[in-house]
UniProtKB/Swiss-Prot annotation:
The gene is PAPLN. Keywords: Disulfide bond, Immunoglobulin domain, Protease inhibitor, Repeat, Secreted, Serine protease inhibitor, Signal. Residues 1-18 form the signal peptide. This is Papilin. Residues 1231-1270 form the PLAC domain. One of its GO terms (molecular function) is serine-type endopeptidase inhibitor activity. Disulfide bonds join C38-C74, C42-C79, C53-C64, C316-C355, C320-C360, C331-C343, C754-C804, C763-C787, C779-C800, C931-C978, C1065-C1112, C1154-C1202. GO terms for biological process: extracellular matrix organization. InterPro entries: ADAMTS/ADAMTS-like, ADAMTS_ADAMTS-like, ADAMTS_CR_3, ADAMTS_spacer1, Ig-like_dom, Ig-like_dom_sf, Ig-like_fold, Ig_I-set. Residues 582-599 have a biased composition (Basic and acidic residues). It comes from Homo sapiens. It is found in: Secreted. It comes from the Eukaryota.
Amino acid sequence: MRLLLLVPLLLAPAPGSSAPKVRRQSDTWGPWSQWSPCSRTCGGGVSFRERPCYSQRRDGGSSCVGPARSHRSCRTESCPDGARDFRAEQCAEFDGAEFQGRRYRWLPYYSAPNKCELNCIPKGENFYYKHREAVVDGTPCEPGKRDVCVDGSCRVVGCDHELDSSKQEDKCLRCGGDGTTCYPVAGTFDANDLSRGYNQILIVPMGATSILIDEAAASRNFLAVKNVRGEYYLNGHWTIEAARALPAASTILHYERGAEGDLAPERLHARGPTSEPLVIELISQEPNPGVHYEYHLPLRRPSPGFSWSHGSWSDCSAECGGGHQSRLVFCTIDHEAYPDHMCQRQPRPADRRSCNLHPCPETKRWKAGPWAPCSASCGGGSQSRSVYCISSDGAGIQEAVEEAECAGLPGKPPAIQACNLQRCAAWSPEPWGECSVSCGVGVRKRSVTCRGERGSLLHTAACSLEDRPPLTEPCVHEDCPLLSDQAWHVGTWGLCSKSCSSGTRRRQVICAIGPPSHCGSLQHSKPVDVEPCNTQPCHLPQEVPSMQDVHTPASNPWMPLGPQESPASDSRGQWWAAQEHPSARGDHRGERGDPRGDQGTHLSALGPAPSLQQPPYQQPLRSGSGPHDCRHSPHGCCPDGHTASLGPQWQGCPGAPCQQSRYGCCPDRVSVAEGPHHAGCTKSYGGDSTGGMPRSRAVASTVHNTHQPQAQQNEPSECRGSQFGCCYDNVATAAGPLGEGCVGQPSHAYPVRCLLPSAHGSCADWAARWYFVASVGQCNRFWYGGCHGNANNFASEQECMSSCQGSLHGPRRPQPGASGRSTHTDGGGSSPAGEQEPSQHRTGAAVQRKPWPSGGLWRQDQQPGPGEAPHTQAFGEWPWGQELGSRAPGLGGDAGSPAPPFHSSSYRISLAGVEPSLVQAALGQLVRLSCSDDTAPESQAAWQKDGQPISSDRHRLQFDGSLIIHPLQAEDAGTYSCGSTRPGRDSQKIQLRIIGGDMAVLSEAELSRFPQPRDPAQDFGQAGAAGPLGAIPSSHPQPANRLRLDQNQPRVVDASPGQRIRMTCRAEGFPPPAIEWQRDGQPVSSPRHQLQPDGSLVISRVAVEDGGFYTCVAFNGQDRDQRWVQLRVLGELTISGLPPTVTVPEGDTARLLCVVAGESVNIRWSRNGLPVQADGHRVHQSPDGTLLIYNLRARDEGSYTCSAYQGSQAVSRSTEVKVVSPAPTAQPRDPGRDCVDQPELANCDLILQAQLCGNEYYSSFCCASCSRFQPHAQPIWQ
């Protein structure tokens, strides 16, 4: 432009000037080139041509005036239906390409400021990216508009599809028109009394063009758009959308609103024409400022009657390779939807078409599989995975190809990586503390913790693969001078009562030089027996092991019992032992050596105290024993009896390698166990579980022990951690799991295993277990270390009570008599004060029967054979609980003097009874038949049924000689005999009776012929487990346990359709009850309802109709009990009761039922897509969803839809309501006229099926048919 302004000045010479003439440069254009190919094949592309500029300028510029390139429109014809968007095709070129470490599928983004940049958004993400500076020429600037991008700029395209054309469409969409072919419809919706929510503004008719709807002022209200069927296109169901262009009614509807947080007027505009009516609504939240609307309709009147309308095409089902689109096609008139058959005279528009037929691009990429487990859990390892090349065609089909095809792709994932680089956990010992003594042999302690990377504190389980360094070690100083404190025997400290804050721990301090009176003058030097422990804050690890004791410690932990009367000699010598020895106390919750001590219930001694053995320190220590006697060492003696152990579990002892192993010794005391509970040990010991030690039993009465016991004797805290725990006196170490090698067995009528003290074993894998406290007849908890221990060890309280108390068929626990006295016949009784009473001398075999409440029933066996003493046995007593070879009471000896131990070389099998015991059980249960014979080591139990050997997979012989039958079948009923394989031995008989569905109940006469069976309810959890041990005939039949149902079971069961559920019903009682399930008072019986052997009801493939209340009824022939269970079927919503078509005469009442299966359901009715509001006069909606329309009119005809909503679920069902004109007044019929049907006017079969003969209008066409059919009542219009 600067040059153009200067040119005139150069052409006008100044007057009188002699300046030389300047020569003008001549830059010219060359010829135009050919037109380039069109940028698109359809839909309006752009072609261009270019021309060169010939210039003589030496600076590289040109002075040619005009454009060097010109453009024109081409291929303006519309693309075929279903063709892909042109901008979307350009974004799809980047599909599968790596972008910031990921691969995306890209879609076009239209809301960027520069409309001609190629901005794309990844599918499923919320950001867009500019892939190119400019889109391909001919790409529309915005969807729904004709303007296109050329060289990165938006250029105008006229309605004649020509580039830079000035021709525009008028409001009627005529190119270059003057707007005379249509008429405008405009107005303002300014109603102010709007309810909160959706309010209809207007309905834009089908065929409308140049639509504009906007708010008069900004507000917090929103516009919404839906079709006449109630389906929302914009802002439906209280979901407000962002500004966008959306397809609706075969046009593009542009929605404009302020950004999030900005307040701007709502605006809608569309080109049209619309292919269906659009309902415009205002979501009102504040006063309406007014909404302006304007649209145009063609001057030609639409054809009257019904016509087809259709919505916009849906998105293509596939992005390439061929997909399909669908749209809604429906019949309308007067902006309302009607059934399709109303438009059947007109051709129906297509509702489905193909789309995106172009082939999918093939892409290749690397794909990696999952990582394999790391080769090391810590300290650095490696893991690998498979990496391979896959080829994808974009349609979801992938296949693996050669890696060479992906060789050029960047970023191949690694196939190997390092893992678990953190440092392994290891034990971290603290420095040793000071020695516990200043002279002599003491102990020093230290703390050992499990530490991880950077010294972080970890749980001890993280270091379980390594042996934990010892927490204590002996320390030796110079010999101490003989001081008064040597008179005290000091035990090891017990567990701390708390793990942090403030705890206490105890130890045993007793006089070591004789009775307590010998130490009376040395009380000032008595070491403390209680000290604080674990005083650190609770966020720090505990300093010493602790227990969780919920009881407050008593001021005197050792509660002395009354004096034990000792036999004959030196009875006073045992008096002080009974006072000091910890086993002479009734409280068993704090036994020494228990690592936790959390005995859940405080048990008080209800029966006689266990008999006491003379402690090893009864006699004063002599100078010959020296000050370093192993019994006074911190960890007691080694198994040899004289070497001091250097640590727990006989550490440092000679010849005890298996004791020092992790899981200790096998029962042979030589082999090393490979795991808890003697894992890896041989099961066969020839009946000798003590490695050659005979399985003899100790006498049940108190024995005067004047010699050293056979078993090792330790302090109470030590023997519980030995291989088989303590003997009955809590001091001596047992030689076997059933108290082998122990003397002084208590006289309680319980199995031997139930008389032993709890033993936590020698390992440290602590777990809560149960043991039986014979002195009170109850079970209590204790902490078990995971290996070794004795047989008084049970997994649950029920198992404990079943194994110990379950063997008694008298009272459940020792019952005190009128004087609180418990009576026994094993040579002595027990006085209320705990003193042993001398047995009365008996001259005959008869034994006096005691009353029932005084401690149990007694019986006498058959008369003994020649030279054999009569054998008496307590009611319910286990036969092996007594010394089989012991001397019988009443045979020789002075009264009040117990017989000395008598070990017989032969083993006599004692029988529980000659008459058969009775066991009752139901089909499918598990039954254990126990043999009460105490067989010799070389003898084995043999079982027979009805005299024949037993051979079946359901019959399994156990190690203890018992027989398990599972599952129980009808043919298992009969008489079972158990006996020894040795000749000349008697057998025990057990009568097994099968209880059927009618529940057989024994009469009192039948009960008197059989010993009472064990109550199956005592073995709760092991259905049908019963045993006849100790069952005897009695004149006092066992009272039946009252029937009881477990009311703690779930009362509400939720299920989904098709699910399999179980409803439990646990009952117990005697006789065992029968279970029946009922529903609505009737037994439940169907192939899908199955009653299980344990009483539960299993329902397969639950259906909606299964929901309701079920009753479990238990009956045992005497008592009855029941409980109900509600089954709730949480299925999908369903609507029933609404037929497809309802015909109602004009003026009658339409009753539309909408029965919805489900709870908390909201029901809404609509007619032709518009909500039906109850007005309280003609239209009513009942709470159950029924719609009532009184005085029906012709304008009420239409499609009624019932919609049910429950949470996120929704379901709807429609019915067509047809209104028929009332029949004319019926004329008196000619009696002589024939009564015939008129099939050309009505289908009489349908009228009969619908029971419409009561309607005079319909019955007039079907006289003959209705005469043969007399309706019972007037039909209800539905």
